[in-house]
Amino acid sequence: MGFRLRNVPLLSRVGADRADHLRTDLDAALEGWAEAVVLRVDERSQVMVVDEQVVLSPAAELGDSPPGNGVFLGRLPDGRHAWAVRAPLQAPDGVPARVIDPRRAGVPFDDVSAQLVTCALALLNWHDAAGFSPADGSPTRPIRGGWARRNLLTGHEEFPRVDPAVICLVHDGHDRAVLARQVVWPPRLFSLLAGFVEAGESFETCVAREIYEEIGLDVTDVTYLGSQPWPFPRSLMVGFHALADPEQEFSFNDGEIAEAAWFTRDEVCEALAHGDWGSDSTSRLLLPGSISIAREIIESWAFHA
């Protein structure tokens, strides 16, 4: 049974112009700063939201020009420039804002907010770990609006690292799919199987290897579905579905999976109706929230006609 994603995964949605040509145009950056807005991300990678929109504060509050730790996110639909900084959160006056951890957010962002938060986290997390060159240990400094760093000794430019990982829904081609729980997860929390791509490995080969290593099943017909950035701290999740035989026994070979089982479509639909991992439901099966491509893949399979 083939199926497609019903919707673009939340963190893959585009609501703003990345405006990469402005990253090296210092004059344009300075000219736009007076009307620009800033997304604050605190040390715990939390942000503030009002309804489905992330809180953006006036850039001028930070000074007359972009700070050294600022990263340029792009241009909003109304033309204003958007930046991000690692800084304490500030709620706007008279607005009921709340602090959220994007990784655990249960309420979807609008498209603009999703793009800004994803981009901000990916860049800021990289800068936190990239103060020194991996080649010679020399200090580096941000350039290109925060989209690169330059080695102060050699002048070599370094760019954000992205770690690709696969995530796959294994099904029988009919009415059953495999869901699994990692050892570190509490009881009742299940999701899809996932793992990082190794050097010299294709996505499809990685899917087959990871599933065999984690639960001992052989898969065929590995089919691409879609992808989603996962900036926690720097992954790109590449989604697939694949076929397996329900008669083949599970074996938990690498110690990462505590349990796995075949669930019927009706069981999965019932679990989806009970919310997600953050729900207070007593359901025996709780599934990931909308922030993850796992949810979109599961829903797309469950509701496929």
Please identify what each model-predicted range represents:
Residues 149-191, 196, 218-219, 244:
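N-terminal strand-loop-strand
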